[in-house]
């Protein structure tokens, strides 16, 4: 399927289908073409990737996989390497890997020579979210994505063949962001929302997720949701903040427990719903489904640990912790939440986790 962004200008195409890398593209506009490739992805898909690179005369540069590449050290190393290759502002980088590879490559493209071209080639489910919207960045010692820029890709080539080699944890982590996009489309009681019921029917359990049931349908849905939100608010001054649903507590969980991003966000979404006006029965229904998909119970530490991490979140304002919350009659809103309310929701979360079979 071909989707096209609907900004006022500088739009780009997003291709989502199996075997998309084998289609014909014209990259001759770019004087140099360099792919920054997650080395783990390259090992798993070397033949497929090499065919694409050779067909389009793209030089390959292997980089570490995952969040470990998003450091100032790797940034400066890659930038110096690219400068030694005499790239120009008409050159193009190809990000072949997951969301972290896209974040990193996009940030390099945004800052090198004050901006060169780049194309996203996502290889994970999670990257469906990161490949849309133009957010790029690397991490600082004190938190994720604290150094970054907005940079739109020229194109997104989403080849679903890459998803076949994902581990079950990677599939679940990526599917979490799709769940987020589904919940962002909810209205009224979550348990009665048509889209929520539909995804629960399509992907009932861990086996369905493992076999990637209807994955093209739900990745496309996630991309369309993200595109609509980003079109309305590209630079995160309003409704785009809703895309941070589940991320405030989720980032604290991710940082402290060293969990995959999406897994942490699943816990974060449940916590955010507990801060909202959603009924416990609706929340338990959602939790049970997430656990059928493979989400494991988390042994939480002291609340104060998570509270201090949440205080460092870059979405906060005036030292107040901001959360994206859901109200059944009014939809989503960004709200400052005080420590007493946060602590109470945390204790409820622990209680509900204990009640799960």
UniProtKB/Swiss-Prot annotation:
Binding residues for Zn(2+): 177, 247, 261
Keywords: Amino-acid biosynthesis, Aromatic amino acid biosynthesis, Cobalt, Cytoplasm, Lyase, Metal-binding, NAD, Nucleotide-binding, Zinc
UniProt GO BP: amino acid biosynthetic process; aromatic amino acid family biosynthetic process; chorismate biosynthetic process
Main subcellular location of this protein, as a coarse class: cytoplasm
InterPro entries found in the cross-reference section: Dehydroquinate_synthase (IPR050071), DHQ_synth_AroB (IPR016037), DHQ_synth_fam (IPR030963), DHQS/DOIS_N (IPR030960), DHQS_C (IPR056179)
SUPFAM superfamilies membership: Dehydroquinate synthase-like
Any Pfam family matching the protein: DHQ_synthase
Superkingdom field: Bacteria
Gene3D superfamilies per UniProt: 3.40.50.1970, Dehydroquinate synthase-like - alpha domain
Keyword Lipid metabolism assigned: no
Function field: Catalyzes the conversion of 3-deoxy-D-arabino-heptulosonate 7-phosphate (DAHP) to dehydroquinate (DHQ).
NCBIfam families attached to this UniProt entry: aroB
Subcellular localization, as worded in the UniProt entry: Cytoplasm
Cofactor needs: Co(2+); Zn(2+); NAD(+)
Annotated protein name in UniProt: 3-dehydroquinate synthase
Pathway: Metabolic intermediate biosynthesis; chorismate biosynthesis; chorismate from D-erythrose 4-phosphate and phosphoenolpyruvate: step 2/7
Binding site for NAD(+): 99-103, 123-124, 135, 144, 162-165
UniProt EC number: 4.2.3.4
CDD domains referenced in this protein's UniProt entry, alphabetically: DHQS
Catalytic activity as recorded in UniProt: 7-phospho-2-dehydro-3-deoxy-D-arabino-heptonate = 3-dehydroquinate + phosphate
């Amino acid at each position: 399927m071909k989707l096209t962004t609907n900004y006022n200008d500088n739009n780009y195409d997003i291709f989502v289908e199996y075997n998309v890398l084998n289609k014909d593209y014209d990259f001759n506009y770019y004087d140099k073409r360099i792919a920054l490739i997650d080395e783990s992805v390259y090992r798993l898909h070397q033949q497929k990737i090499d065919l694409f690179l050779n067909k389009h005369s793209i030089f390959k540069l292997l980089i570490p996989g995952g969040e470990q590449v998003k450091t100032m050290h790797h940034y400066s190393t890659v930038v110096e390497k690219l400068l030694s290759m005499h790239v120009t502002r008409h050159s193009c980088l190809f990000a072949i890997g997951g969301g972290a590879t896209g974040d990193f490559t996009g940030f390099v493209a945004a800052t090198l020579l004050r901006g060169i071209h780049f194309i996203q080639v996502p290889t994970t489910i999670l990257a469906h979210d990161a490949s849309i919207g133009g957010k790029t960045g690397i991490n600082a010692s004190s938190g994720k994505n604290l150094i970054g820029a907005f940079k739109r890709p020229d194109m997104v080539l989403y080849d679903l063949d890459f998803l076949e080699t994902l581990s079950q944890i990677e599939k679940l982590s990526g599917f979490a962001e799709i769940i987020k996009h589904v919940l962002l489309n909810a209205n009224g009681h979550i348990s009665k929302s048509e889209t929520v019921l539909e995804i629960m029917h399509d992907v009932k359990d861990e086996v369905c997720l493992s076999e990637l049931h209807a994955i093209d349908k739900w990745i496309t849905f996630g991309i369309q949701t993200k595109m609509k939100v980003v079109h309305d608010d590209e630079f995160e001054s309003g409704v785009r903040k809703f895309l941070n649903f589940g991320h405030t507590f989720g980032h604290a969980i991710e940082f402290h427990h060293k969990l995959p991003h999406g897994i942490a966000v699943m816990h974060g979404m449940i916590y955010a719903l507990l801060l909202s006006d959603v009924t416990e029965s609706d929340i338990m229904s959602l939790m049970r489904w997430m656990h059928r998909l493979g989400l494991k119970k988390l042994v939480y530490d002291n609340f104060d640990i998570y509270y201090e991490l949440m205080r460092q979140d870059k979405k906060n304002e005036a030292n107040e912790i901001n959360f994206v919350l859901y109200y059944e009659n009014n939809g989503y809103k960004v709200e400052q939440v005080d420590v007493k309310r946060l602590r109470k929701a945390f204790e409820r979360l622990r209680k509900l986790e204990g009640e799960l079979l």
